[in-house]
């Protein structure tokens, strides 16, 4: 956490323990976080939501394939993320890290939206290749993504 010499960060708290946890983003009301995690029985990154204090962590993605790049829509009524679960329910192989950090550009990624509890899953992209890294406009009417 923050060291005694740290001048810019205060009230720093660890919210996740164990596994690999990444890419956490706030809901517009500041009450929740959405993030990707692999831990315990979850061997491949999945999308989770938790309260801002770290309580009530729960998976909202399908539990299949690999997921990444999740966000809340501004109105809080939907979430957005990329997943490989339709290409294969299995976890894709990890990239070769022997030459340093690399991002797994899996051709099976497509972009999905869902309710914050994971229900009402809707596929937004269905093209061959990598569709991920989506972000949402401030008004929630547009998304942009890498393809």
Model-derived regions: residue spans:
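Blade/loop signatures of beta-propeller domains
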Residues: 1-10, 109
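A short beta-strand motif characteristic of beta-propeller blades
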Residues: 12-15, 56-61, 120-125
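A flexible loop/linker signature enriched in serine peptidases of the S9 family
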Residues: 20, 37-47, 61-67, 82-110, ...
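Residue-level detector of Asp-centered blade-edge/turn motifs that repeat once per structural unit
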Residues: 28-29, 74-75, 138-139
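Hydrophobic beta-strand positions that form the internal "hydrophobic ladder"
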Residues: 30-34, 79, 143
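Short loop/turn segments that connect beta-strands within beta-propeller blades
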Residues: 51-55, 115-119
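Solenoidal tandem-repeat scaffolds enriched in leucines and small polar residues
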Residues: 117-147
